[in-house]
Amino acid sequence: MGKKYLTISNNLCINCVKPLSAKNEKIKKGLMQQHTEENVEQQIAELTAQVEALTASAGVTNTNFAEAYYYLSIPLMLIIHAGFLAYEMGASRAKNVLSSGVKNILAFAFMIPTFYFFGWWVYWGFPTGLTLSEGPMGISGAAYASSIAWGWGDSAAFMGPNITDQASGVFFGAFAMFAATTASIMSGAVIERIQTVGFVILAIVLGSFAWVVAAAWGWHADGWLVTQWGVHDFGAAGLVHAVAGFFALGVLMHLGPRIGKFNADGSANHIAGHNMPLTITGLMLIIVGFWGFLMACVIIPGEAWSWFADKQSTIYGTPITLSSLAFNILMAIAGGIIGAWIWTKDPFWMMSGALAGIISTASGLDIYYPALAFIIAVSAGVILKPAATWLENRGIDDAVGAVTVHGTIGLYGVIMLGVFGWGYPALAIENAPVITLYGQIVGAVVFFLLGFVPGYVCAYILKALGMLRVPAAVEEAGLDTVKVPAQGYPEGIAPSGPASS
């Protein structure tokens, strides 16, 4: 009985073990699956956190790089002013050398506060025209400008110390240097006879208003010249150089030539500067500084300002690389020098040809193939001196050729892009207008008017008020003798020899 019971019990136990084992296995598998799913979810959460951390780190890196990039462009552009300083002082006669230098330094000094107080606001307020309304991209108009570009009120955080803002100061700084460069272009044309106060007023009008309106219209994603006409001017050939050059022309028409420049029959006399090597050195410094100018025309990924999250672009949002920019700038400099040397053999115009090469290709440096940039620059170097002679034959005394180098060649560069860049998107948006010859001509005309009209009108007013030109006796004696309480060469001998009258 006991044995049978044991047998039956054993049989029952054996029969029970199988279903129990299967059930346990199922439970075990379920637990393992649940554990695996939990591990996967945990791993996904950890990976997501790592990706977010890396993305945030990359964003900080991009922002820091962009901040450093524009910060570096500011002192590089300041080299332009060192160049203009040497350029104008060398082109002046010894009796006017310090006056020319002081004037150029004052142009820079007055640009910074005036651009801070109203020039920056003009850039963001005026893109759609004189209506001060918001444009299609939503980054323009009076309300928007007041929110980010006013030195007080709601936008004060963008225009002053703010530890969380790594964009506003360096971006403003780069644009302020564009403004100062624009004013300095006009400075050289009027040396040796303009009143300092009158010059400062003209510099403020040009650097903190006239060119800024041109930039708002043609160098802004909401600019009406861009959105309606497809105007493209990457390196500011028109909106900086042409505006400044033709502003200078308007001023020169009222300022008049230096005493002794023209004879009674209208023929011109050459008035040599006191130090050609200094002038040539200044031109080379300007060329060095323009690397900073053009690098600041590139939009680097960063907070608030970039079109793309991961790559640089033009101010229009179209793609560009620093590599392509380097190719084209170098070819343009070389082409301009070669073209001017072939035509003139004159060291002054040869170095001016380097500037002409950069300016003539500036509008399309983001588009041109290097060989094309070289050809355009050579042609600009060739036409440089004949264009200056044509202007001189009409009674305009431009002491350094600023109207020709910046004005004429600036418009030439804008129009050349219409010829060679036709069909290329002008703006990085859907249904964007394309670059056309007629669009670029419209832009060129607008840039001419934005320069010439304010220059002509302001000079007319200053002349009527007796604030434009120094008296003839002061001019003949030398501005350093009468207007500046110092002399560049107190021994009376300039490096190149006796000062000429």
Across the structure, where does each feature detected by a protein language model lie?
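Hydrophobic alpha-helical transmembrane bundles of multi-pass membrane proteins
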Residues: 33-501
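Short, positively charged and aromatic/hydrophobic N-terminal segments
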Residues: 7, 11-28
